Amino acid sequence: MEALKAEEFLAGLISCREAFWEKMNAERKSYGAEKPLTPAIVLRRLQFGVVMERKAAEVTARWVGDIPDLDLQQPMSEYVVNELKHTSILRKRIGELNGDPDALWNQPLRELKELWDYHASLGSLCELIASVQFGHEEFFPRTSKSFIERVQSIDPQTASVYRDTLLADEAGHEWIAPEILRRYATDAETQKKCLEALKIGCELFGKAIQSFNQSLPA
């Protein structure tokens, strides 16, 4: 099997990712992802964000030193810093709401732990990027916009945290993941592993999202 050209390879990853998004999006309402927000649900959503942001930083940080090109190593290190900054911002907001910033971090849902344990087990930078930054992280802006619209009326400060900081920062580093894959996923075996990592990562993410929504207070 020959390696695909970069744009053909990326198109295949995108097709797989978007097919999963369509499936997951169609199922979200059935397990309560769009239920009316309450202060308790908002707090739980913030605690979920703490786990997602901090874990993304942790699993990515170990690979930054292996990126051979400085023009990608530097922005990837800045990505890690941003994810930790977001973690701190979310923890601060949870504290302002008199919640426990580490509730879900210290007692993670089984499906959420399985998701990040999988990412931590991946054997290359490209597999991780395909699964996380090019994979399910692409869903974050989409679900966050819905959350912002619904939370604005009951908690405008939390809406501002997501809109003005988290989403704004996400937009600034969206280019990094595809460029890493273009540059380093150039052989057939790596491309195959990347596709598999994306598929598994999206499936595990879907299970984690479903479990999280089903665990929300009534």
Cite the ranges covered by each PLM segment:
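Non-heme di-metal
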Residues: 1-218
